[in-house]
């Protein structure tokens, strides 16, 4: 069946009270953006607590569904038939046509669920359920009614128009992008950070990203891998700016002047400082990392506290309590896993100490960083001046 309309269901937005319209408008904007490059003409509208997407002429159904299923704020996409006439007899004809078109095999149980928002329509919801159920049974005797656990729930909404639907394609949930500020993601080539970006974007935060590149120790292919990961995240987050920092000279200075068991912590602290500078320049309110407690030596509570002390912006760690397998499952779900496991080194995996400190003391780390005085500031400025910015979109 070629559907001409979708009903868009949303979750948390519906309980936003007086600000609900702002979230609805933000969601509609994201829907329009998602469908912008899809073949066909789409009209997005809202009416009485419902958001609709109506198609004018031919369109790419599969592509439209794929794009909508990645829009944060949507919990369900219901392909539907819209009937402009509110003639009761016409409704009976249309509901039979709908069942026949959508379900070629009729050996299933069903239930009709009517919502009569327009109280001028004759009858009650219960009486309409019964009459439409009878009409369907007369047309298709092999079908059976089951009001407790039907195989198919046929929904009829009587509003300005009459909507008929029975299929709900799940969306990602969450909040529309841009309704909760913006933040800077420290993006590496691993499994965790793309998932962290996805998780924060799901809460309505507009995400930017920074990647620390260390040529010749990291290859151009490693850089390309991170760009690919950013593109995959942007399928959900929308277009994002990816800032690329050349971190080589800073890493070499740290390696040359600081204790080797503190290399990872000190490098992470300077990454945080640079990420914060870029975030502030771009008006972001927080930093995002993919760390979780205890996963590696640099992710003990003491290490995370020491890393946080390098920045003044809040640091969001949406994966903090996740097991690795849980993170892997999300990465597989959002399509980043296969790219993340490609064997290209990033700057977090070179110059790694054999026995890194796991319980760093901030005062000791700051004392070690004093050995970089007269060197590091100039290198930081050079890194900022030579940074690259790419607008990434799926």
Residue map of PLM features:
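Active-site adenylate/phosphate-handling loop in enzymes that bind or generate adenylated species
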Residues: 134-136, 173-180, 251-252, 256-329, ...
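Structural beta-sheet core signal
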Residues: 185, 209-211, 244, 289, ...
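Conserved G/P- and acidic residue-centered "switch" motifs that form tight phosphate/ATP-binding loops
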Residues: 190
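A conserved beta-strand->alpha-helix junction
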Residues: 230-256, 346-347
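RNA-binding accessory domains that recognize and position tRNA/RNA substrates
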Residues: 1-184, 194-241, 309, 357-362, ...
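A short alpha-helix-loop-beta-strand transition element characteristic
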Residues: 335-343
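Small/polar glycine-rich anion-binding or flexible loop at a beta-alpha turn
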Residues: 295, 343-351
């Amino acid at each position: 069946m070629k559907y001409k309309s979708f009903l868009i269901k949303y979750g948390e937005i519906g309980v936003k009270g007086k600000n609900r319209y702002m979230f609805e408008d933000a969601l509609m904007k994201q829907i329009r953006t998602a469908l912008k490059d899809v073949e066909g003409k789409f009209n997005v509208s809202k009416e009485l607590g419902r958001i609709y997407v109506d198609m004018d002429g031919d369109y790419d159904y599969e592509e439209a569904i794929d794009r909508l299923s990645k829009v944060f704020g949507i919990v369900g996409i219901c392909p539907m038939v819209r009937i402009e006439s509110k003639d009761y007899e016409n409704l009976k004809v249309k509901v039979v046509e709908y069942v026949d078109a959508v379900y070629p095999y009729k050996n299933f149980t069903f239930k009709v669920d009517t919502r009569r928002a327009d109280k001028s329509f004759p009858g009650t919801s219960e009486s309409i359920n019964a009459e439409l159920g009878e009409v369907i049974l007369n047309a298709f005797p092999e079908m059976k009614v089951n009001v407790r656990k039907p195989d198919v729930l046929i929904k009829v909404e009587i509003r300005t128009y009459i909507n008929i639907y029975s299929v709900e394609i799940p969306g990602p949930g969450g909040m529309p992008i841009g309704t909760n500020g913006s933040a800077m993601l420290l993006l590496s080539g691993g499994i965790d950070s793309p998932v962290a970006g996805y998780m924060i974007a799901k809460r309505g935060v507009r995400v930017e990203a920074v990647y620390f590149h260390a040529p010749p120790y990291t290859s151009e292919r490693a850089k390309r891998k991170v760009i690919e990961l950013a593109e995959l995240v942007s399928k959900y987050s929308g277009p994002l700016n990816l800032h690329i920092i050349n971190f080589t000279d800073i890493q070499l200075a740290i390696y040359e002047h600081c204790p080797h068991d503190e290399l990872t912590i000190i490098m992470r602290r300077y990454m945080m400082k640079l990420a914060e500078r870029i975030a502030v320049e771009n008006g972001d309110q927080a930093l995002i990392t993919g760390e979780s407690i205890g996963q590696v030596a640099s992710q003990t509570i003491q290490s995370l506290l020491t890393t946080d002390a390098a920045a003044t912006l809040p640091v969001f760690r949406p994966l903090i309590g996740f097991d690795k397998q849980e993170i892997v499952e999300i990465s597989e779900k959002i399509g980043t896993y296969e790219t993340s496991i490609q064997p290209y080194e990033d700057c977090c995996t070179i110059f790694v100490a054999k026995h890194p400190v796991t319980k760093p003391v901030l005062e000791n780390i700051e004392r070690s960083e004093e050995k970089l005085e007269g060197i590091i500031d100039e290198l930081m400025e050079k890194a900022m001046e030579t940074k690259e910015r790419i607008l990434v979109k799926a």
